[in-house]
Amino acid sequence: VGYVGNFNFPDNHLWRSRATAAHHNELSPNMGLAYVRKDTRETSRWGMELGFQGGRDSEEFAFLVGERRVDGSDVLRHLHRGNVSYLAPVGKGLTITAGLFNSLMGYESLYAKDNANYTRSWIADNTPYMMFGVNAQYPVSDALTVTAFVVNSYYHLAHPNDQPSYGGRWIWKATPRFTLMQTLYAGPDQTDTSMEFWRLYGNQILEWKGDD
C-alpha cells in the first residue's frame, strides 16, 4: 500500500499516461505478490519461477495504450512469472528459459521494493517489465555474458499481430563496480508487419556500484 502526494491535485486522482503508481492523493493498494523460485545449478539443472500478483500496478503495466490485447489479459496480468529453465552442459553452461520471465530491457523493476524510488521513471513505464517467449544466456567469460531472445511482442499482453519479435543483450562487468549493458530489440509491433514499420530499440545502461 502506498500514498503518492500530487500537488497538482487532479480531480480524478490519476497521473495520466502512467502504468505504475498512477493513483495519487489516496491510499492505493499498488502491489501484492507471492511466488516460488528454483534456480538452476550444475547439480540440479532444471529451474522454475511461478508467482501471482494483484494491485493497481498490475492493471496496465503490460500494455500500450490503444493496442489490442491478448484474450484473457485481465486474468493473465495477475501472473508475476511463469517459466521453466534448463542449464545445458554446453561449454561454461548455456541457460535456456521459456515462458514469462523478467524483461531483458530496462533497469527499473515493476516492484517498488527493488527500486531507488517508489515511482518509476517515464522510460521504465515505456519499456516492458516482463517478456513472454524464450531466451538463451551464455557466460562467455567471467566478465561477459550474452543473451538472445524471441518474444511474442514488445508488451507481453499486447497483441498487435501474430509475428514474433527478436533481440539480444550483452553484459560486460568491466570492473567490480562498473558494468555496461546493452539490449537490442527488433519486431513488428503494429498491425502492418512490413519491415519498414518494425520497432527498432536500443537500450544502453552504465551501472556504477559504490560501497555497500
Stretches found by the model and what they are:
Residues 142-145, 168-212:
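Detector for outer-membrane/organellar transmembrane beta-barrel domains
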Residues 59, 156-158, 190-194:
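A generic structural signal for short coil/turn motifs at secondary-structure boundaries
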Residues 160-163, 197:
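Short, solvent-exposed loop/turn segments at conserved positions within beta-propeller repeat blades
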Residues 1-16, 21-153, 162-164, 171-179:
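Outer membrane beta-barrel
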